[in-house]
Amino acid sequence: MNKLYRSEKNKKIAGVIGGLAEYFNWDASLLRVITVILAIMTSVLPVLLIYIIWIFIVPSERDMK
Protein backbone atom coordinates (compact mmCIF):
# COMPACT_ATOMS: atom_id res chain seq x y z
CA MET A 1 0.00 0.00 0.00
CA ASN A 2 1.27 3.47 -0.87
CA LYS A 3 2.08 5.87 1.91
CA LEU A 4 1.52 9.60 1.61
CA TYR A 5 4.73 11.60 1.94
CA ARG A 6 6.36 14.77 0.64
CA SER A 7 8.41 13.84 -2.40
CA GLU A 8 12.14 14.47 -2.44
CA LYS A 9 12.50 13.71 -6.17
CA ASN A 10 9.43 15.41 -7.56
CA LYS A 11 9.31 18.72 -5.74
CA LYS A 12 9.27 22.40 -6.59
CA ILE A 13 8.81 23.96 -3.13
CA ALA A 14 8.29 21.39 -0.36
CA GLY A 15 7.26 18.25 -2.25
CA VAL A 16 3.61 18.30 -1.17
CA ILE A 17 2.12 18.26 -4.68
CA GLY A 18 4.77 15.81 -5.90
CA GLY A 19 3.97 13.47 -3.02
CA LEU A 20 0.24 13.65 -3.73
CA ALA A 21 0.90 12.95 -7.40
CA GLU A 22 3.02 9.90 -6.54
CA TYR A 23 0.42 8.66 -4.03
CA PHE A 24 -2.46 8.85 -6.54
CA ASN A 25 -0.24 7.98 -9.54
CA TRP A 26 -1.09 11.25 -11.29
CA ASP A 27 1.04 13.62 -13.34
CA ALA A 28 2.61 16.16 -10.95
CA SER A 29 2.59 18.97 -13.52
CA LEU A 30 -1.14 18.57 -14.09
CA LEU A 31 -1.78 18.53 -10.35
CA ARG A 32 0.29 21.70 -9.95
CA VAL A 33 -1.75 23.45 -12.67
CA ILE A 34 -5.00 22.34 -10.99
CA THR A 35 -3.69 23.64 -7.65
CA VAL A 36 -2.81 27.04 -9.13
CA ILE A 37 -6.24 27.32 -10.79
CA LEU A 38 -7.93 26.35 -7.52
CA ALA A 39 -5.83 28.91 -5.65
CA ILE A 40 -6.80 31.66 -8.08
CA MET A 41 -10.48 30.73 -7.85
CA THR A 42 -10.43 30.75 -4.02
CA SER A 43 -8.38 33.95 -3.57
CA VAL A 44 -5.15 32.01 -2.85
CA LEU A 45 -5.32 32.08 0.97
CA PRO A 46 -7.23 28.81 1.61
CA VAL A 47 -4.99 26.79 -0.71
CA LEU A 48 -1.86 28.43 0.70
CA LEU A 49 -2.92 27.64 4.28
CA ILE A 50 -3.67 24.01 3.41
CA TYR A 51 -0.30 23.72 1.65
CA ILE A 52 1.57 25.13 4.66
CA ILE A 53 -0.29 22.83 7.06
CA TRP A 54 0.56 19.82 4.88
CA ILE A 55 4.25 20.76 4.96
CA PHE A 56 4.21 20.17 8.72
CA ILE A 57 1.77 17.22 8.86
CA VAL A 58 2.90 15.00 5.98
CA PRO A 59 6.33 13.40 6.57
CA SER A 60 9.05 13.72 3.95
CA GLU A 61 10.12 10.79 1.83
CA ARG A 62 13.44 10.79 3.68
CA ASP A 63 11.64 10.33 7.03
CA MET A 64 9.64 7.39 5.66
CA LYS A 65 12.77 5.30 4.95
From Swiss-Prot:
Main location (coarse class): membrane
Subcellular location: Cell membrane
Membrane topology: Single-pass membrane protein
Pfam family, one: PspC
Alphabetical list of InterPro entries matching this protein: Phageshock_PspC_N, PspC
Keyword Membrane attached: yes
TM regions (residue ranges): 37-57
Full protein name: Uncharacterized membrane protein YvlC
Species this protein is from: Bacillus subtilis (strain 168)
Gene giving rise to this polypeptide: yvlC
